[in-house]
Amino acid sequence: MAEVEPDVSAAALAKKRTFKKFSFKGVDLDALLDMPTDDLVELFPSRIRRRMSRGLTRKPMALIKKLRKAKLDAPAGEKPEVVRTHLRNMVIMPEMIGSIIGVYNGKTFNQIEIKPEMIGHYLAEFSITYKPVRHGKPGHGATHSSRFIPLK
């Protein structure tokens, strides 16, 4: 039994780290990038299919043009320039992967780097519009807060 353990550890050291290849609904990333929009839309959930069937209007197309330009202007191996937008309802498409988008949350622009896992989601899902409540801390607005502040 002692002889088996060194073989297992040696095999584990020799084995290289392999990363899971990304796929969206069973289609790999390269195929998604080459896929026509009509075929791509069929992979999306019904709400997004309905939205895409109505077509992209001027504002979303302008955002996609700016993203393309930012990617072309970026030097090789560098991240593209941030493109700011108020279009929180824009659906993330495979073409947008690798771009950096500043999504407005009502106060500031939150920078989001688009990753393959974000395909089919809205930009708004990654830019929260409120500050989450932190309960139980004494201070402004808490009832009887002076009771819980330690004396120095």
Swiss-Prot record:
Name of one Pfam family that matches: Ribosomal_S19
GO MF annotation: an example: RNA binding
PROSITE patterns for the chain: RIBOSOMAL_S19
InterPro entries: Ribosomal_uS19, Ribosomal_uS19_CS, Ribosomal_uS19_euk/arc, Ribosomal_uS19_SF
Transmembrane stretches, start-end: none
Entry annotated with the keyword Cell membrane: no
Protein name: Small ribosomal subunit protein uS19z
Species the sequence originates in: Arabidopsis thaliana (Mouse-ear cress)
Record lineage: Eukaryota, Viridiplantae, Streptophyta, Embryophyta, Tracheophyta
